[in-house]
Structures are given as C-alpha cells and as structure tokens.
Design a protein with these regions (language model features):
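PLP-dependent amino-acid enzyme catalytic core
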Residues: 1-142
C-alpha cells in the first residue's frame, strides 16, 4: 500500500513572525487534508494496524463534523477502510461535500439534549453502531 501522502503530513512550512516576542509559526493548514488533525487521523490508523485492532475490513466510526472527520475520511480512503461519521444537523454543507468525496458514510443525529447539544445523542449513536456493525472500531476522540 502506498502511504506517500501520509508521509507528507507534518512537513508543513514555518514562517517567522516579527514582533515582541518574535516567533515561528507552523502552517498546519498545508497538511494534505488541510489541518493539524491530519496527523491524529493518520496516527490512529497506523497504530491500529500495527496493534492489529484495525484491518482492511474494519469499519472506522467516529463522532466528528470538522477537520478531524475530514482527516479520518481521507486517511480511511487511503487505507481502504469504510468510515462512518456521526454528525448532527449543524454539519457545514462544505464539510458534508468533502466527507462525501472521501466516501464517508454519514449518520445524522437529530435529537438535542436539554442544553441544546447534540453530543450525547451522537455518542449514543456511535455506541449503537459499534454494537451493530461487526469488525468496527471507535476512534473515540473524546
């Protein structure tokens, strides 16, 4: 399997910022899939394969709707794993399109809790999917 693009992660440019104090800033947006989350997604899959808890037949599941979801979808595509992404109705249309481009299966949580948050419902859906889908792996960023 050619993981060349994964090996490119983290090799992002730095720029010098003049000021008091002066400092260098690393431009993580130059990672292949657009954010620092690329590294975490690649690490999860690499480590899972090394420890043999993930195989090519494993369905990767996570509750995320932003940069981590996009990075996981892309990395799963490289490894040829199915990626199921649990999101809520606040998913940005552009992120939905990107996830679809990486063939992510999208499950939408539509019930908010008493505080208006969807996180509990999203996590309940993830747990249900883990129970129902054989050979699945929950990344569990929380």
């Amino acid at each position: 399997m050619n993981l060349g693009i994964i090996n490119a992660m983290g090799n992002t440019p730095t720029v010098f910022i003049h000021g008091s104090p002066s400092y260098y800033a690393k431009l993580e947006g130059f990672n292949p899939f657009g954010s620092i989350k690329d590294r975490a997604a690649a690490y999860v899959l690499q480590k899972g394969y090394e420890e043999e808890v993930i195989t090519p037949k494993t369905n990767i599941i996570e509750s995320s709707s932003g940069n981590f979801a996009i990075a996981l979808a892309a990395v799963c595509q490289i490894y040829r794993n199915v990626f199921t992404c649990v999101v809520d109705k606040n998913l940005l249309p552009i992120n939905k399109k990107i996830l679809e481009c990486y063939n992510a299966k999208i499950v939408i949580a539509d019930k908010a809790d008493e505080n208006g948050s969807y996180l509990k419902n999203r996590l309940d859906i993830v747990k249900d999917l883990i129970d129902k889908i054989d050979n699945s792996y929950w990344v569990n960023q929380y």
